[in-house]
Amino acid sequence: MSVMDLANTCSSFQSDLDFCSDCGSVLPLPGAQDTVTCIRCGFNINVRDFEGKVVKTSVVFHQLGTAMPMSVEEGPECQGPVVDRRCPRCGHEGMAYHTRQMRSADEGQTVFYTCTNCKFQEKEDS
């Protein structure tokens, strides 16, 4: 037995056949070759060691919950401080606002205004 064969048959630790017993990486599935070789470290395992091993997978889909419709009064678009700004749609004086950092950090924030009367929304880059 050569030194290379000895290195490939001695493992660093004991593990399940799904993992390389030398480096711990996930092993590829056995193919037509006589050995399964770890892609990361090159450790070899005889393909006969996998005889009788059953691989079972399952996919579980969880049902999505139904979203509760938001009432106009509860919506996030109505939250925030109110400023003296005239709504371009209904002419009402007073719009709620909130800010978000939509662009890169060295750019200004984006201010979102919402009319407290008709819920019209507009944005302004500052």
Curated annotation (Swiss-Prot):
A zinc finger (C4-type) spans 20-41. InterPro entries: DNA-dir_RNA_pol-M_15_CS, Rpa12/Rpb9/Rpc10/TFS, Zn_ribbon_RPA12_C, Znf_TFIIS. SUPFAM superfamilies: Zinc beta-ribbon. Keywords: DNA-directed RNA polymerase, Metal-binding, Nucleus, Transcription, Zinc, Zinc-finger. It comes from the Eukaryota. GO terms for cellular component: nucleoplasm; RNA polymerase I complex. A zinc finger (TFIIS-type) spans 83-123. PROSITE patterns: RNA_POL_M_15KD, ZF_TFIIS_1, ZF_TFIIS_2. A motif (Hairpin) lies at residues 106-107. GO terms for biological process: nucleobase-containing compound metabolic process; termination of RNA polymerase I transcription. Component of the RNA polymerase I (Pol I) complex consisting of 13 subunits: a ten-subunit catalytic core composed of POLR1A/RPA1, POLR1B/RPA2, POLR1C/RPAC1, POLR1D/RPAC2, POLR1H/RPA12, POLR2E/RPABC1, POLR2F/RPABC2, POLR2H/RPABC3, POLR2K/RPABC4 and POLR2L/RPABC5; a mobile stalk subunit POLR1F/RPA43 protruding from the core and additional subunits homologous to general transcription factors POLR1E/RPA49 and POLR1G/RPA34. Part of Pol I pre-initiation complex (PIC), in which Pol I core assembles with RRN3 and promoter-bound UTBF and SL1/TIF-IB complex. Core component of RNA polymerase I (Pol I), a DNA-dependent RNA polymerase which synthesizes ribosomal RNA precursors using the four ribonucleoside triphosphates as substrates. Can mediate Pol I proofreading of the nascent RNA transcript. Anchors into the Pol I active site to monitor transcription fidelity and cleave mis-incorporated 5'-ribonucleotides. The TFIIS-type zinc-binding beta-ribbon domain contains an acidic hairpin motif (residues Asp-106, Glu-107) that likely coordinates the nucleophilic water and magnesium to cleave the scissile phosphodiester bond and release the mis-incorporated 5'-ribonucleotides. Belongs to the archaeal RpoM/eukaryotic RPA12/RPB9/RPC11 RNA polymerase family. This is DNA-directed RNA polymerase I subunit RPA12.
